[in-house]
Amino acid sequence: MMLIRVLANLLILQLSYAQKSSELVIGGDECNINEHRFLVALYDFWSGDFLCGGTLINQEYVLTAAHCKTRNMYIYLGMHNKSVQFDDEQRRYPKKKYFFRCRNNFTRWDKDIMLIRLNRPVRNSAHIAPLSLPSSPPTVGSVCRVMGWGTITSPNETLPDVPRCANINLFNYTVCHGVFPWLPARSRILCAGVLQGGIDTCKRDSGGPLICNGQFQGIVSWGPKPCAQPRKPALYTKVFDHLDWIQSIIAGNTTVTCPP
């Protein structure tokens, strides 16, 4: 009887810690200065407000979330600290934005993806290098890396100068469907997070990468509010299922056939 009571008290302490963590920590620790050379920052042209993250996939293209779209934007590459500029930082503008319009076997939740062609190529440097597209699909159970300049508190926003990085877990889609039952029964979207809470992507992390086993597998799409709640993972657009579309556009075919 005493053992049961002790275990119950430990469980209560564990849950209360997870709930406090979800209020205090979002997005993990500051990223290492050398681990995010592909991470870009999208800004509103007129207000100068930071909007979203994105991923450089070659010298001319950036991949981000479709809901990050705005009529006029500019893109910073090679940035680490918003308040301290590197000599090799580069600024580009969208030449063309591409959106995934296919409907076959894709729900509206699966299509939060935008491919941006830059107005001129980017030069690789000490703080700038592209991240390759995935060569294989992600595996449930993988530990994945997320990063971004998104808010580190929720629901109120506190935006950091330096991007935060964190490790989260990739779950079966059924986990997210159980949390958000209004989602379609089947979806291509990825479900990832930390079930204990306390670590999560949040507002303005949108568009940034989900990197699993060294491969660019997801794009930050959306999640619960407030962020980092226990047992409430977030959702990520699955890059692998859009490979044909991405590669066809890069090759110059803008009237691509929808993938199966």
From Swiss-Prot:
Residues 25-251 form the Peptidase S1 domain. Disulfide bonds join C31-C165, C52-C68, C102-C258, C144-C212, C176-C191, C202-C227. The active site is at H67 (charge relay system), D112 (charge relay system), S206 (charge relay system). The keyword Signal applies. The keyword Transferase does not apply. Transmembrane segments: none annotated. Keywords: Blood coagulation cascade activating toxin, Disulfide bond, Glycoprotein, Hemostasis impairing toxin, Hydrolase, Protease, Secreted, Serine protease, Signal, Toxin, Zymogen. Its activity is inhibited by diisopropylfluorophosphate (DFP) and PMSF, whereas EDTA has no effect on it. Glycans are attached at N81, N105, N156, N172, N253. Monomer. Negative results: does not act on factor X, prothrombin and plasminogen. This is Thrombin-like enzyme stejnobin. It comes from Trimeresurus stejnegeri (Chinese green tree viper).
